[in-house]
Amino acid sequence: MSLPDISRRRSPVPQEDWPLTPNALRPSPFPNPVLQALYSLSRVLLFPTYWSLDQLLGCWAPSVRSKSLGWFKVLAGSGVLLPLVVVGLPLALVGLALWLPLQVWRRPFCYQPPPACWVWPQPWHPPAERRRCFVFLTANLCLLPHGLAHFNNLSHSLQRAEAVGAALLDSLQSSQYRVSECSQPPPRVPGGELKATLPMGLDFVCLQEVFDLRAARRLVRVLVPNLGPVIYDVGTFGLMAGPYIKVLGSGLLLASRYPLLRATFRCFPNARREDAMASKGLLSVQAQLGIVDGHPIVGYLHCTHLHAPVEDGHIRCKQLTLLLEWVEEFEAENRQSDEAVAFSVLLGDLNFDNCSQDHAKEQGHKLFSCFQDPCRLGVCQEQPWALGTILNSSMLRHSIACSPEMLRRALRQEKGRRLYLSGPLHGSYPAQSWKGRRLDYITYRRVPGSRLSPEAEQVTFSTAFAGLTDHLAMGLKLQVVCS
């Protein structure tokens, strides 16, 4: 896919001493190139067996077995792939012996800075510019390794990553990176809309389930020259207390239009079943946004993906409590006394909804007294315009579910929502208010003592990734006003 560099086409603006702290993050996750080279070698040794096992697992997925000649394909594929696994095992054991101890020195994320020709967005300078809007996007892409993706009725993760990148690129090119215009005054109640495209003027993008590193790198190649710095390959791998062996990362990927000052990742200590193999946790970053009275303006983003199994609500509640503790710790440790904080945003796939009785504990968690959810009115009460974000897995290959515009039209009607969205786990809505299950959240809060006040202006539910994942993308336009 050709990746035009729209950063070169933007008109540079006078930006003396901006960013205030350039190159704040080291690109490599290792402190020296020798460790990085050894880590790359370990991945090369592991890859043949990883690929063979991945393809073998894909052969046994229910979606493959149910097709015509399904069992014949399963047996034929297994007959070819099993010998490849056996042949690759000696190399894999050497690679594993090298890979495991290297995790001690590995920082839990990779950082890709923008190119040298990159022009940063114009810094925010209140009170001359009293208000500025920031646009956030969250999306669960289900970019699992090929075999695991089949179990979600999806496949071809690398091809889907290319298509997701094309959709993101189209949004970035269309917006041409003008600063998003704000409503004056800000609306008393945020509005919501359903679109077949992604929000324009994206400033921050948080993606979940980008587990496949090859897929992550394809997204990085799109985002870095057209949006800004990217943090990817996030997670703590290797042997953990439990005991667990973490072979998958967190699946988180974060891209920012603004310079990033600091970043950290913390892995949840509690996990069960299939989630025990993944390094789910909280990625926290501090971004530079502008300057007020000679002092820096910063914003905090906290991206996460909670425990998945439906019946494990107690684990999700513990993770939510940990999230709040880690958010407070990160912001307290990194905030300087002279900094003005524009916002603190927590976003991602929380894996519970606001309509199912099975999620009563999560719905009443103190998270919602600390952070504002613009889609939520209360426990089991959503805004009239709010929508579910998880699709019905049995309909993912339907022609309408694979077309952004056709899916958007279908979801405008209750009949379409009931057909293409996943419904509550137990019980049902009244007929006039059926919305589906919203697992994706973008929440925000004002930091006490700050003269900057954030307010939600617009929430967007997007079908732009129709046919590419089992979630709708979700966007938030946040207006920050300097008092």
UniProtKB/Swiss-Prot annotation:
Residues in the active site?
H471 (proton acceptor)
Location(s), subcellular: Mitochondrion inner membrane; Endoplasmic reticulum membrane
| Tissue occurrence | Highly expressed in testis, pancreas, epididymis, and brain.
Q: Hey, where's the site called Important for substrate recognition on this chain? A: N351
Q: Name one GO molecular function term.
A: sphingomyelin phosphodiesterase activity
Which EC number(s) does the record attach to this protein? 3.1.4.12
Q: How does activity depend on pH?
A: Optimum pH is 7.5.
- Primary location group: mitochondrion
Kindly list the cysteine pairs connected by disulfide bridges: none
GO biological process terms, alphabetically, are:
ceramide biosynthetic process; ceramide metabolic process; sphingomyelin catabolic process
| Reactions this protein catalyses | a sphingomyelin + H2O = phosphocholine + an N-acylsphing-4-enine + H(+); N-(hexadecanoyl)-sphing-4-enine-1-phosphocholine + H2O = N-hexadecanoylsphing-4-enine + phosphocholine + H(+)
Instruction: Report residues binding Mg(2+).
Output: E209
CDD domains in alphabetical order: nSMase (cd09078)
Q: Which UniProt keywords apply?
A: Endoplasmic reticulum, Hydrolase, Lipid metabolism, Magnesium, Membrane, Metal-binding, Mitochondrion, Mitochondrion inner membrane, Signal-anchor, Sphingolipid metabolism, Transit peptide, Transmembrane, Transmembrane helix
Write down the membrane topology.
Single-pass type II membrane protein; Single-pass membrane protein
Q: Name one GO cellular component term.
A: endoplasmic reticulum membrane
Q: Can you tell me where the transmembrane regions are?
A: 80-100
Q: What pathway or pathways are given for this protein in its record? A: Lipid metabolism; sphingolipid metabolism
Q: Which cofactor does it need?
A: Mg(2+); Mn(2+)
The record's region (Disordered) falls at 1-20
What is the regulation of this protein's activity?
Activated by anionic phospholipids, specially cardiolipin and phosphatidylserine.
Q: What is this protein called?
A: Sphingomyelin phosphodiesterase 5
Q: Which organism is it from?
A: Mus musculus
The encoding gene is: Smpd5
